[in-house]
Amino acid sequence: MAIHLYKTSTPSTRNGAVDSQVKSNLRNNLISGQHRCGKGRNARGIITAGHRGGGHKRLYRKIDFRRNEKDISGRIVTIEYDPNRNAYICLIHYGDGEKRYILHPRGAIIGDTIVSGTEVPISMGNALPLSTDMPLGTAIHNIEITLGKGGQLARAAGAVAKLIAKEGKSATLRLPSGEVRLISKNCLATVGQVGNVGVNQKSLGRAGSKCWLGKRPVVRGVVMNPVDHPHGGGEGRAPIGRKKPTTPWGYPALGRRSRKRKKYSDSFILRRRK
């Protein structure tokens, strides 16, 4: 991904840094429904998720996370922008006439060939089970947790997990969060790293660009009134008046563990995420 710096012609473009434009060529059989950005409100109009609303209309692209076109080679035809995720997607034309979108692997270019199966080469973009001859230290993404359900782990832009061990019926992975976890060796994973690794280098440059993404302004609780937030009130710039910060509803914030206790998958986690 190439970062494009705007020419400083207006205040709004002075700090803008965006990636090179990747167009979308929609296929009717690979899109579904006309979706607006989530407004963060329920059927009664009550805010249930803050800082969301507005945004440009979107069409959902159907992504093939399962990679169940077994042993059929496919060719990358286009690399496209997807407004529903920060990673790019690429259109694959398979030998049997099937067309599908997949996550764009880093380094893949138009014309490359990919394939999924149990006896396929361990090369970028190919999908295969962890039980194959995949060497330790291999970079993978789009990893299944439940066999046949489709990839659920390491799907964001630049995400990559590492295969660090195999023992018995399980494989040990180091996830992008730092968590070390056991996964069934029969689960499918895609070789390589998700593309668009420089997504964090982008700078929107102005508030309007953030609004296009459906993200509304975030107001600090300390500048609110006491009726609106536990941190609010006081004369001038006052401290929060509590030992620890809290949410608008009084629950502990900034560091509290939100994972449920005694969850069924606790036995699969060897090291907690950082």
Swiss-Prot record:
Where is the stretch described as Disordered?
225-274
| UniProt family annotation | Belongs to the universal ribosomal protein uL2 family.
Query: What binding partners and quaternary form does the record give?
Result: Part of the 50S ribosomal subunit.
Main location (coarse class):
plastid
- Keyword Chloroplast in the entry? The reply is yes
**Which superkingdom is the protein from?**
Eukaryota
Q: Which organism is it from?
A: Dioscorea elephantipes
GO CC, alphabetical: chloroplast; mitochondrial large ribosomal subunit
Which keywords accompany this UniProt record? Answer: Chloroplast, Plastid, Ribonucleoprotein, Ribosomal protein
Q: What taxonomic ancestry is recorded?
A: Eukaryota, Viridiplantae, Streptophyta, Embryophyta, Tracheophyta
UniProt protein name: Large ribosomal subunit protein uL2cz/uL2cy
Q: Where in the cell is it found?
A: Plastid, Chloroplast
According to its UniProt entry, the protein's GO biological process terms are: mitochondrial translation
What are this entry's molecular-function GO terms?
rRNA binding; structural constituent of ribosome; transferase activity
